[in-house]
Amino acid sequence: MIHLGVTQMNLLYSHQKLNNRWIILFIMIMALWLGMSSFSTAESPTDAIIKEQAEHLNTEPVEQYWDKLMKDYGGYFPESKTPTFMELLLGTKGISMKSIFKGLLRYVFHEIIINGKLLASIVILTIFSMILETLQSSFERNTVSKLGYSITYMVLIIIAINSFSVAIGYAKTAITSMIEFMIAIMPLLLTLLASMGNVTSVAILHPLIVFMIHSVGTAIYVFVFPLLFFSAVLHIVSSLSDKYKVTQLANLLRTISLSMLGVFVTVFLGVISIQGTAGAVRDGVAIRTAKYITGNFVPVVGRLFSDATETVIGASLLVKNAIGLVGVVILIMLCAFPAIKILTLAFIYNLSAAVMQPLGDSPIIACLQTIGKSLIYVFAALAAVSLMFFLALTIMITISNVSVMMR
């Protein structure tokens, strides 16, 4: 009897233990299901950190450039394709390269239509000057025709020089906007770099980039554009007379200006890339050492602190890359629209020279061709400067990626 009672008690205890296991298993399954459902409906911790960092950053200095671009040129893009700055930054609403190209193409046609008046004026004045030039050889008393030809020729020269000055003004305005934009976006990128532990890179790049941007911009204003302007003027003066030519001096000034531009771009990119990469390597080694020491020698919370720091650094990296990519888009658009204006003017003058050439060989045609070629050089200078800032911004984006790879 005693043995039977013990056996029943054991069976009852086993049954109760089995029920408890089933209850525990049911609770674990319910907890796992609830956790999965909440995970599917809520955002991940990394996304929350990214959104929080983006909202706490002072993006107003950069955002005003995007707002100004949309105010000035947003009409060339479909309204549904122009997101706000924060939508572009967080990726909730983007802008495709297709819509950008469509907007730029619309702007090209708009500029061609606007400059059609300039084309018509140049063609009419050129035809009128050729008629007066023909009258000079048809009559013995050609004083009036010579005077009319000279006045017409001077009017064309004034129009050409004025167009060239306007093009240089477009280029200077674009370069000034890009310099100010680079100065505005640097604190954002450097702050995120510092939050990722890239203290050495920030200490090196902050004064270096500010100094190089201002130095290169000032040098282009003081040397490159004035030399291109004087080169164009000397070419025009050389077309006035067959006896007195200064084309060699004009070509020399043009060569010097383009050579100086190449030197500025090379020095700027070389210094920033070398110093930035060296700083990124040092930061990567330092952060990796600190992470190893924290994770292995700090008891209990060391590994947890190391993983949390890694999550924050990864979120900062994503935010920095997003800001960098938005900055690249803004930088391209700051350069693209003035560059289109300059290219349109160059196209107008080259087209005028091509249309007028079958009517006869005239100094005016050579003058128009010279202005068109000089405008192409102004565009090349603007494109080189924008490429320099574009690569500098890309280097800034890549620096933290190098330090993360080192970790």
What are the language-model segments listed below?
Residues 341-349, 353-357, 361, 376, ...:
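Membrane-helix cytosolic exit motif
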Residues 2-28, 32-125, 130-149, 163-173, ...:
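Gly/Ser-rich, low-complexity
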Residues 150-163, 182-199, 219-231, 236:
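Mid-bilayer segments of alpha-helical transmembrane spans in multi-pass integral membrane proteins
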Residues 181-185, 192, 354-358, 362:
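Extended, low-complexity, charged alpha-helical tracts
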Residues 321-362, 370:
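Helical hairpin unit composed of two closely spaced alpha helices linked by a short loop
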Residues 146-157, 178-186, 215-221, 252-266, ...:
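Small-residue-enriched core segments of transmembrane alpha-helices in multipass membrane transport
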Residues 205-330, 334:
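Generic multipass alpha-helical transmembrane bundles of integral membrane proteins
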